[in-house]
């Protein structure tokens, strides 16, 4: 008998650990296929709701928010890249240059959920790739439209 499970995944597109967490969750659910039928719904969480238009240099942002040094940031990027590789999510090897406001991306994800949970899941994955692999501006409506069309 298959058990039904509803999962609310609360995350921000700009968070690399959220990309890793989603990939790890997908792997775990794949292993439970036939035993667990999971309904995955994405809930918004803005890490940086006050992020200005045009975003901010990622190194500057991490130093201001967490007090980290460039050396610490390089180490954590390496850790993130390795953990991502472990769960099948490839990050841009050069990291990201900027961090952007994700409010409109969350609005788009909400709309996608109203259409279909599968569409929301596909959009979430496309947005994570656009942000973490391609370094796209997550506040750009053009970027969001391309992700929605993918």
Where in this protein do the model-derived segments appear?
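Short active-site neighborhood of thiol/selenol oxidoreductases, capturing the structured segment around
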Residues: 3-16, 21-25, 40-43
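Acyltransferase
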Residues: 128-139, 148
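Structural alpha/beta surface segment adjacent to cysteine/selenocysteine redox centers
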Residues: 22-131
């Amino acid at each position: 008998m298959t058990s039904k499970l509803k999962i609310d995944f609360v995350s921000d597109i700009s968070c690399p650990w959220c990309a890793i967490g989603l990939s790890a969750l997908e792997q775990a659910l794949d292993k439970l296929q036939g035993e667990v039928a999971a309904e995955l719904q994405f809930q918004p969480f803005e890490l940086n709701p006050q992020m200005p238009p045009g975003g901010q240099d990622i190194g500057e942002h991490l130093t201001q928010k967490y007090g980290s040094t460039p050396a610490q940031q390089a180490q954590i990027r390496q850790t993130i890249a390795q953990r991502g590789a472990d769960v099948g999510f490839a990050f841009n090897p050069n990291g990201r240059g900027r961090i952007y406001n994700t409010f409109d991306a969350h609005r788009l994800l909400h709309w996608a959920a109203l259409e279909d949970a599968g569409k929301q899941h596909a959009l979430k994955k496309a947005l994570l790739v656009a942000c973490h692999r391609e370094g796209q501006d997550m506040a750009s409506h053009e970027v969001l439209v391309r992700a929605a069309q993918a």
